[in-house]
Amino acid sequence: MESRMSRLVPVRSIDEGDSHDDSRDRISAFELKSGNGFLEEEVVGVEDEVEEDEGEDEDEDDEGSEERSDEYWLAVSIFDGNFDGVNYKEYANYLGSPDRLPVLKEFIKLLQPLPNDLLGALGKLSSRLYFIAEAQNIDRILEELSGQWMSTHTSTIWGDNNSWCHIVLFSLLLLNSDLHNDENIGKQSRFTCKMFIENTLYALRKDCERESKELSKEREQDISQELAIFYENLRFNPLPLFTRVDKSAPSVISNIHRRQRRSSGFSTKSPSIHSLSSTISHGSSMALESHTTSNWKFHHNLPLPILYLKENFDNEFVGVNGTFWTMDGVLSIAEKKESKNRRSDDQLASTAEVKSRKTPRKLLFSWLKKSKKPSIFEESNSPVAFLNEHSQWSRARIRITEGRIFIFKLKNNYKDAFLKEQTLESMKALSSSYVVYNLFEALAEVVQENVVIGTFPSSNNILSNRGNFTITIPMGLHEYKVSLEFQTDTVEEAYAYVQSINFWAARLTPVPSAEFEIVSNDEYGWGSKLLREREKHKKENPTDRNPITNAKVSVWYPLLSLDLLYNEFDNIADQTELIKRLQEIREFTEKLECLIDKHNEMKPRMVSAWAGSPYFEKVMDNWNRRYLYLNKQYEKTSIYMKSLTLASEII
């Protein structure tokens, strides 16, 4: 069957009625060709008439909010979904109009730091903007995104070619539409990975011809591998759909620029997917890569890079089953059962629909398809599936080694002895599906510790001699967390798997070496100046019962944390020796203990200062929110510390 879209050809962006000027050509759209001729479908952009304002990227980190421009604050309100000038579904049209380029620039700046790959940048944009708009407005938004992404990512396979980034972003939107648009089902064939790569390369070659340049075979090969990774990612993870948040929710903008400039403990120049793709798996190479990249490489028989700093003792223990370094066996994995009411209109995935030249005013992008049903590898039925007598379990071979967990769901009921003799490569043929996850930021727990079983448990799955454990793995930018539950033959075996997972997670996950929380001028209820002044006032005026009524209290949320930072940076490379990492975790755990103690000591002062104030409940909510957050971090680092401590006693 011939593809409905065998060529993706860039066409010039020309305003209707304007004369063509070759010096101002740019790639702004794609004309879609079929094997049997033209489909007469295209997206036509409009040439932006507003020149970019140089010097607009000056560091404004320390400027007061009163010095920021009106365009900035307008962009902030749009970013937070609180701009009432137009319906939030029209935000893209609003930002993309020619006379609002300054606002668009500020809006894209609020997305900083942009992820290290173009698909991540596009996903971050679509998670903050309802991406339905007219063609020319979408085109301007993508062009601005391309320019700002290029300015901070200079060492990629795209070089300094802004138009290439623009082309690829548009191509990704078309691919997302093709893969996840319900209207295509049963009518037209879907893009294959090969078709997507060929069409995009065709558009890039045309752009090179227009610029009298040449796209080398070596560069094409690199780009093809990057595009293949993008395809695999989009195939399973549609672009997110922005939905308007509650106006009472905290604004996440006021500190984004601070987080970008002050997170000195980590480099903002992480390796790109391209650099990870070219990494050779040997002892001297070390990089962290996305889960999608790992899966794509594993499914295409490419070597996986080393994720950690390999030391002499690693050579002794890696591959020895039953140790912190390696756990390998056949377990039961809980399958995901989707609730009938799980999906809602707010969970629609992003799709793109290309309209014909005859209807240029129609909407370019429509969000039509609901998210695909997760596989058993995405999340389990519940964190305590073993208590549910209706839970379904599948046999799977699980291997944990060198910072990764390999999961092979078995086709047949093979004997354990036979499976243990199989290599990871031979296991592929024996599996109905398989997946590999990096254990970066992962956390495993034995479930029995957190479950109180009644006197007469009804579940047939509760067996005293069996163990159950869960593993939670953050999936990176704008994505979900994977939560899996496994069942072992014994509780001791469950503990062994948990220790191995947490051991590798502790080795891979960096520890903040700078400020754990950035100092903020916002008042959350425990500002030392406010509390001192209030205490002084009460001491000098003991009969005064007037509460605080004129304060500006913000909602607290983590300004800088591992979770937030890793959502911004898809790939973070780290090289730390095991003993040094253990020391870092100990120091960080002690710091968290001090923060928790100080936070507890603050509560009586806050109660006294804010008693009777209309802000009392808000500041107490802030206190509780921060307390729970600090405890969560403390529990996690304590688990990491315990695993590394036990391992250090062996080496």
Swiss-Prot record:
Residues 39-65 have a biased composition (Acidic residues). It is found in: Cytoplasm; Cell membrane; Bud neck; Bud tip. Residues 13-26 have a biased composition (Basic and acidic residues). Residues 1-26, 38-69 are annotated as: Disordered. One of its GO terms (molecular function) is guanyl-nucleotide exchange factor activity. GO terms for biological process: actin cortical patch localization; positive regulation of phosphatidylinositol biosynthetic process; protein localization; regulation of ARF protein signal transduction. The keyword Hydrolase does not apply. The keyword Cell membrane applies. InterPro entries: PH_GEF_YEL1 (IPR056468), Sec7_C_sf (IPR023394), Sec7_dom (IPR000904), Sec7_dom_sf (IPR035999). One of its GO terms (cellular component) is cellular bud neck. PROSITE patterns: SEC7 (PS50190). Residues 19-230 form the SEC7 domain. Residues 362-508 form the PH domain. Keywords: Cell membrane, Cytoplasm, Guanine-nucleotide releasing factor, Membrane. SMART domains: Sec7. It is a peripheral membrane protein. Guanine nucleotide exchange factor for ARF3 required for localization of ARF3 to the bud neck and tip and involved in actin patch polarization. Belongs to the YEL1 family. This is Guanine-nucleotide exchange factor YEL1. The lineage of its organism: Eukaryota, Fungi, Dikarya, Ascomycota, Saccharomycotina.
